[in-house]
Design a protein with these regions (language model features):
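Membrane-interface anchor segments at the N-terminal boundary of transmembrane helices
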Residues: 7, 88, 95, 416, ...
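Multi-pass, polyprenyl lipid-linked donor-dependent membrane glycosyltransferases
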Residues: 34, 65, 88-96, 124-159, ...
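Loop-to-helix entry region of an early transmembrane alpha helix in multi-pass inner-membrane enzymes
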Residues: 68-72, 80-102, 123, 138, ...
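Transmembrane-helix motifs of polytopic, lipid-linked glycan transferases
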Residues: 88-115, 154, 158, 498-501
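Transmembrane-helix signature of polytopic, membrane-embedded enzymes
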Residues: 104-131, 149-150, 515, 519
Length: 574
């Protein structure tokens, strides 16, 4: 393929991706996620009240429930086009997501181990990214996914340049220059990783994947080489390998230190601000997006985590907490290990559903103080603030069953429910007993099932036809779920299979660099999947960041398939 034809094809695919995203952003805007309203309120408060707060009205108390990256991004756009112009935000996000497609193509170009297939790989990866509906839909929302995907690909590309410079065989004449360039790229990786974490705290897992790749990818060849040389040269006089080993180890430490230092500098202003305002060392955001002193029902969350294995239960037993009553009869059988345990859970839920009755019958319950909460906002409902368990402090859930504009007090007055510390302690005791009885189930089997439900989903969230494919009898024919959901499930399978095929191509290349990229991809996906499968809210949107990586690997696989098909065709003609 000539340069002109390749550039033309690249431009066409990029325009297709842009048109798709602009169309979705304009015609399918989605303002339902509560997180979006929280971010928008914070951005407006920064511009209008000059304070970082999630309160919709005075006194606009300072807040730390969300990291400042995305609200400041919104504020920068609002300051130009108006404080409520989310249409402009969506258009900018469409441009950024299109830029992500271009970066995906560049990353695939560098990861392809075969020089003759690099251009085809880039075009294939670009095509996969351009038409990917799973990432495109987030251009229509006021959420962090678009920027996170862009920064993820930029981080992987920076690490690719740094690792490539670091692992390339060089001469004495160019060694210092290449090392300087490599160190610069590690600083860029730290900067991009820090900004990504300011958008979504769990993005730090991608930086961890880069760091592990640096250590493993740099030291493994050294260890293997030393073992091989020891086996071959026993009894013979050979050059001492220790100076080279020391040089490599020194460079690994220096590279990691440079990346970490820049990363810490990015987080420093937010950390200092939280220390000065709240007297807390809080470099990210609180684990459950709670304000200082706010009660979090950790016992109930642990109990849910001891049995929940499917995302369909999240909307039934997590988001309604402190908003709606919870019926013990709706719980699955897996939530109980015995009839006695079910009775204990039923008694606790009875207290939760009817707090007034429990206060009259339980003297201990009468002494429980009301749950401390930050100033309520329509977009920071109790469901979204108190039920999310996330050790990386990712934003609270986007979905719940609250009506817009209702405050937390109004919800509690209407529902008459309350999760008290006493009730929560009861759930904590049951959860610990369940974990002690079946540690394998809790630590291994349930995370595997949650990982499955996150990955093998239709990933139709925020599309007009969103829903679950199974059971088929529950499909909504009015919004054509019978067509769209099977299509999206099929696309998920296609992207997954292409990703696996691309990983196989990298492994089979038997080149150090190719396997290094495979290690980076596996760690970037694996660390995140392990974390979120260990939580009690396995939402499929938490794996949307995997699709850019699958596009890169898929491009590598398509290039291999295309070349093999062409070779077979030429052989038949001959």
């Amino acid at each position: 393929m000539t340069n002109g034809r390749w550039l033309l094809a690249f431009a066409i695919f990029l325009l297709i991706g842009l048109a798709f995203r602009v169309y979705v952003a304009h015609w399918l805007p989605n303002d339902t996620p509560d997180d979006g309203r929280v971010y928008a309120q914070m951005a407006r408060n920064v511009l209008e009240q000059h304070v970082y707060s999630h309160d919709p009205e005075a006194p606009f108390n300072p807040s730390l429930i969300r990291l400042p990256g995305y609200p400041l991004f919104l504020a920068s756009i609002y300051s130009v086009v108006g404080h409520t112009n989310n249409g402009a935000v969506r258009f900018v996000q469409a441009l950024i997501d299109t830029a992500s497609c271009a970066l995906i193509a560049v990353l695939a170009f560098y990861w392809q181990p075969d020089e003759k297939k690099k251009r085809v790989t880039a075009l294939a990866a670009l095509a996969l990214a351009a038409v990917c509906p799973f990432t495109t839909i987030y251009t229509a929302t006021i959420l962090t996914e678009v920027l996170t995907n862009f920064l993820l690909v930029a981080l992987l590309l920076s690490a690719t340049f740094a690792l490539g410079k670091f692992t390339t065989e060089d001469t004495e004449k160019t060694r210092k220059q290449q090392w300087t360039r490599s160190l610069a790229w590690w600083c860029v990786a730290g900067l991009v990783g820090g900004i990504a974490v300011m958008m979504r705290p769990d993005a730090g897992l991608f930086l961890a994947a880069v760091g592990l790749t640096l250590v493993i990818g740099s030291l493994w060849p050294l260890v293997s080489g030393l073992r091989k040389k020891t086996a071959e040269d026993q009894g013979s006089k050979t050059k001492d390998p220790r100076p080279k080993a020391r040089r490599i180890i020194t460079r690994v430490i220096a590279s990691g230190a440079a990346m970490s230092l820049v990363f810490i500098l990015v987080l420093a202003p937010w950390t200092i601000r939280n220390w000065r305002v709240f007297h807390l060392f809080q470099p990210l955001a609180p684990q459950h997006a709670e304000m200082p002193g706010e009660f979090v029902p950790r016992g109930y969350l642990l109990w849910v985590r001891s049995w929940l294995d499917d995302q369909k239960y999240v909307s039934q037993f997590l988001w309604p907490l402190e908003v709606e009553p919870i019926d013990v009869d709706e719980l699955p059988d897996s939530a109980f290990d015995s009839p006695e345990e079910k009775k204990r859970v039923a008694a606790l839920l009875e207290k939760y559903n009817k707090p007034d009755d429990s206060e009259n019958s339980d003297t201990d319950g009468a002494s429980v103080e009301p749950t401390a909460r930050p100033t309520p906002t329509p977009s920071a409902s109790p469901a979204s603030q108190s039920t999310k368990s996330n050790p990386t402090a990712s934003p609270a859930p986007d979905e719940n069953n609250d009506e817009e504009g209702e405050s937390e007090e109004t919800d509690q007055e209407q529902s008459g429910v309350e999760m008290t510390p006493d009730i929560d302690a009861g759930f904590m005791q049951i959860a610990r007993e369940r974990i002690a009885r079946h540690p394998f189930r809790y630590y291994v089997w349930l995370p595997i099932k949650r990982a499955r439900t996150m990955w093998f989903d239709t990933h139709s969230q925020y599309w007009p036809f969103e829903g679950e494919l199974l059971p088929l009898d529950d499909l909504d024919y009015d919004i054509h779920q019978q067509y769209w959901l099977p299509l999206f499930a099929g696309l998920t399978a296609i992207y997954t299979l292409l990703g696996l095929a691309g990983a196989w191509v990298l492994w089979r290349a038997r080149k150090f660099e190719a396997r290094q990229w495979l290690l980076l991809a596996v760690l970037a996906i694996g660390l995140r999947l392990v974390l979120f499968s260990s939580l009690e809210n396995p939402e499929p949107r938490y794996v949307v960041e995997f699709f850019p990586i699958l596009c890169v690997l898929g491009g590598i696989a398509i290039a291999r398939i295309a070349v093999s098909t062409r070779s077979d065709s030429d052989g038949v003609r001959e």
